[in-house]
Every structure is written in structure tokens, then in C-alpha cells.
């Protein structure tokens, strides 16, 4: 380090606080910095910023900072007039004691209060992607050199290349998704996930039973994206009768900060999707989460959510307009034979090589460009599969079809209708039916039915119960209701 990086050493420069300031002058913003909202030091490794322990800062940076100051003190002592030599020697002796572990950690702790950063200061460029070989401008395709000032905590882990090594990845996609329009759509939704801002507010269901390759696609994309990909526990998306407390740690939320692509896999048969959680995670509102033993952090969402499953979750209200606008079902219709399915292991290994991950990253960037040029525009196969999903998972619709009559000239007190719904749910084996409040809200979405109020109470106009002896039970599409919650 050169002499002009710091001021000349004097008495004031040898205090603990002065040493902490000197540490940040030498290394702050370019090599290390402290984030006080999560209580962690960040270190720049030449590509991205990452959390490090306090001991790393003490041993690698504070110690070196003291060594540099000692060199300056010794140099000035040797060059000073004889009258000051003794004083400088005393300072030098005293300062050597700062090389012990306690003094180094004291210096680091003092440095933590010098212009600390927040985690929200990182990953703020949604149209840039940090790759192993540079900082990629998604809009122009220009690859720029890495800089600490880019404030990235994520990296793909592989290089961006403008042309693929081979056609292997694209050829496999043609086998897994033969329909060209659906394959083109998947290309665009995967590419759209590269942007660090939420524009579409959608969740993508990859649905299909058996060996169909959907898992290979999702996991290969995640492998190519490295730090930009994360896994969301499937239970987060499912309805539960137990609500988390306000102060409960939510690491699954905190882990989404800065992520572009998050996936969740395989719900059990009969699980019910949490509409409120899906709306929250796919919306554009600020998210707030907390890791264990840390303060909460707030951030704008940047992730795009993909859900792969053999058994799609049930819905409590299939007429919920917000959910219909969010859920897109991509059908995987090809089922490979057992012999063909055994290739998946080898295929997965092949797609995880560095060359293949670079090809997939190039394909994703190409998909982003297609998305920006064309928009998403779901093809008929996706529209049909999405419509079928809502029709087959319409609990309110099944209740009305089996137990009710819709007519302008009829009405029923709303508590009587809910009581009938609870009885129907019990007979259907639904263990966790809608609450009365959720049921009343769902009824507001039923065409031709409206909520009214009189002195006698609240009622629904346009609907009434069919006499019990005139009802014809229907079969629940997709199998038994007994496992529903």
C-alpha cells in the first residue's frame, strides 16, 4: 500500500477509534463493509459481496491494517529528530499490543458503526445479471467488468456465452415438450425470470404424472442460475390451520431477497393451496422476512415462482379472480417408458456440466429477449390446462352443483347456507372446510348471487338449497375428496 493512502501518523491516529476509521479508509466499500440490519460483515471476492464472520475481518483486514500503521510509525520514528525518537518508540511499543486478538476484535466492533450499509442497498439493478465472466446488461447483451459498486450478492456461477456449445439442451426440450407453442412459452417464462423485478405476478404450475422431464427442466435452470435460484418449501404454499406468530422467524421469505428464480416441488395428494400466500408471494408489494436470530429485513420482490408436481393442489375458491389471474398451468403430457426414464439420471448429470449450464444460461437470455419482444401470450394448451385445473378444483362449484339451485326468485339466510356447506364438506371428507368468512367471500364470486341485508339479518339472493331428498351426489373430479384439507 502506498504512503498517500492514509494521513501521517500522529498521537490522535493511534486511538482505537482512529484505527477503526483507518481500517475502513483502507478497505471499506471496495473490500469490506458492515450491514447493521442483519448484523453481518460483507466481503467482496472480486465477483460478488458475501457474508463473512467477524473473525475473518479481524484476521485478514484489521491485522493487516495494524501492520500497515506500524510500518508508518516505524518509518516516521526513524526519520524524526532525535528528540521525538523516544516518544515514537514508546508509541510503537504500545501499538504492537493492538496486534492481539482482543484489540483486533475491538477495532472491528468499532468499525461496524462507521457508515454501515443495509441489505436493501444490494442487488438493485433488475436488468443486470451477475455472471462468472462479467456483469451482463440484459437489455443490450453487453458484458461489463465486475465492480464492487455493482453491489451484487448473487452470481450465476458460470460464464455467459453468446452462442451455445451444442444443441443438446434444445434437443432434449423438444423430446420433453413436443408442442412447439408450449415449448416457446416455457422458453419465455423461464427467460422472464432473469429480470429482477416482478411484472407478470404469476405462478407457473408444471403438472404431469410419471417420468415426463419437468423436474429436469426446473433443476437444470436452477443449476445454471446459481445464487439467483432458490427453493421454497412446498408447505409455504399450502393451506394450514396453524398460523405463524408475528415474531416467528420466516427464513423462507428472507431467502427470496435478490433471487430471480424460485421453485417448489411435489405437494402431497389432497393438499389445498393457500390463496393468500400465493397472492402475497406473486404480488409486487414489499416483502418482510427474518432469519433466525436476526432483525427483519424488507425488500421488493424479484423472484418468479415455479411449482412442479404430479398432484396439483386443491383450491378453496376456484372463482377467486386474483388466483385465476396468477396461476398458469403448463401440462407435461409425454411419459417416458421405464427404460427411457432411466436415462434421466445420466441426462441430469450431463446437463449439470459447466458447458451445459452455460448453454442453458444462453438459452435463458435468449428467452428473456423473446419475452421482451413478444410478451408471454399463453398458448391454447396452457389456457386449456389452466381452465381445466380451476374447473376440477372448484369446491364451491361442486357444493352448488350438488346441493343448491340458482334462480333470481330465491334466497336463503347466509348462516343457513354456510351450515349446509359445512355439512356437505363433512360428508365429502373435507377435513378443513372454509371458515364462514371465507365462504361468504367466495359466494360473492358466484355469478347471479348477491349478498343482501334486512332487519332479520343477512342473506344471499339468487340461491337456495335443493331439498335433501332431491339431491344427486356428484363425483369429485380428480379422485376422492378424503385427503383434502
Region locations from a protein language model:
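Active-site-surrounding "flap" and adjacent substrate/cofactor-binding loops of secreted or lumenal enzymes
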Residues: 62-66, 70
